Amino acid sequence: LFAFDACKETCTDIPNGKKRIALVIPIRDRWEHLQILLRNLVPLLQSQHLCFLIVLAEQVIFHSTVFSSSLLDRFTLKAPGQPFNKGLLMNAGVIEALNFMPFHCVVFHDVDLIPISSNLSYACPPYPRHLSTQIDKFNFSLPYVGLVGGVLFVPLDQFLRVNGFSNMFWGWGAEDDDFFER
């Protein structure tokens, strides 16, 4: 979890129409991608004077029920070879963000998608909005109707209304298709 000092100041005096957003970034062994994303995304968010919190959600296995920080480091292992559960991580990211600050909108952001335009608004819409509709690897068009993976804005009340993402999908994909259907 992190919020920049300048953003904390912005959070105390939110301009009309601006809302607090939590960005949840599920990650697995893509730390170089994360550095590139943050170098590009944070200045964009700051230039839009948004109040934001970024939550990094990494899948780990706990080998201890003791959760003090020193023991947590010793008894936490990454989950190599374990199937990825992106839906579970995104749900956990929302819960952690709610423990840190109240927010109106959650943005689920894949770590390997970089905004290519400074005109791309990250302000919270009143309805779910798929932001990554033009990805270079898909020749700037969606491969199928209903794709909402990549970068997705969801007002918190609507996310809670559908009970978040399913935790039942292991491996890459399907959690966002299920979310779209609900």
Residue locations for each model-derived region?
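N-proximal low-complexity "stem/linker" segments adjacent to membrane-targeting elements
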Residues: 1-43, 47, 67
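Surface-exposed beta-strand-to-loop junctions
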Residues: 15-22, 51-57, 70-75, 155-163
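Short, flexible loop/turn elements at secondary-structure junctions
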Residues: 27-29, 61, 77, 135, ...
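Short acidic, S/G/P-rich loop/turn micro-motifs used as interaction or catalytic elements
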Residues: 30-32, 63, 113-115
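Active-site-proximal specificity loops/subdomain of glycosyltransferases
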Residues: 35, 49-103, 138
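Conserved short acidic donor-positioning loop in nucleotide-sugar-dependent glycosyltransferases
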Residues: 41, 59-60, 111
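Active-site machinery of serine-nucleophile hydrolases
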Residues: 46, 52, 132
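Conserved catalytic core of nucleotide-sugar-dependent glycosyltransferases
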Residues: 81, 85-90, 94-109, 113-182
